[in-house]
């Protein structure tokens, strides 16, 4: 008797072709779905952008965080002499623009903390923020709550 050999059928080849066709169909479906999603998002962005523009609050509802010009102008303004020394011993550069102070340059000091800065720098800063750029304390007449001013009393209570 001779050994029995398996039938010579194309069953193994049929599975390979079926798997390859299935993978190609799946890849095609994923690419089509991605194209549709990207296409719908790009057209949806234009509509969403126009909705946002239409739903903006009115300028009357704008909140101003900085100080008014008369308050800023009330802070002492000095012109540096040839020695270029500031009234308080913070002889480093301006903390806002990081430039050195020059002779005969106008400097404005914040009365609450005595920190000094270039007049143009600190005026612009105080128009947008009501705190000292260096120590973050509020120079405003109506004491605004600042992170540092809240922590200082706590530090004295611990001791």
Curated annotation (Swiss-Prot):
<keyword id="KW-0472">Membrane</keyword>
<dbReference type="GO" id="GO:0016740">
    <property type="term" value="F:transferase activity"/>
</dbReference>
<keyword id="KW-0812">Transmembrane</keyword>
<dbReference type="Pfam" id="PF13639">
    <property type="entry name" value="zf-RING_2"/>
</dbReference>
<comment type="similarity">
    <text>Belongs to the RING-type zinc finger family. ATL subfamily.</text>
</comment>
<keyword id="KW-1133">Transmembrane helix</keyword>
<protein>
    <recommendedName>
        <fullName>Putative RING-H2 finger protein ATL69</fullName>
        <ecNumber>2.3.2.27</ecNumber>
    </recommendedName>
</protein>
<feature type="transmembrane region" description="Helical">
    <location>
        <begin position="13"/>
        <end position="33"/>
    </location>
</feature>
<dbReference type="GO" id="GO:0016020">
    <property type="term" value="C:membrane"/>
</dbReference>
<dbReference type="InterPro" id="IPR001841">
    <property type="entry name" value="Znf_RING"/>
</dbReference>
<dbReference type="GO" id="GO:0008270">
    <property type="term" value="F:zinc ion binding"/>
</dbReference>
<dbReference type="InterPro" id="IPR013083">
    <property type="entry name" value="Znf_RING/FYVE/PHD"/>
</dbReference>
<keyword id="KW-0862">Zinc</keyword>
<keyword id="KW-0808">Transferase</keyword>
<feature type="zinc finger region" description="RING-type; atypical">
    <location>
        <begin position="94"/>
        <end position="136"/>
    </location>
</feature>
<comment type="pathway">
    <text>Protein modification; protein ubiquitination.</text>
</comment>
<keyword id="KW-0863">Zinc-finger</keyword>
<dbReference type="GO" id="GO:0016567">
    <property type="term" value="P:protein ubiquitination"/>
</dbReference>
<keyword id="KW-0833">Ubl conjugation pathway</keyword>
<dbReference type="InterPro" id="IPR044289">
    <property type="entry name" value="ATL67-70"/>
</dbReference>
<keyword id="KW-0479">Metal-binding</keyword>
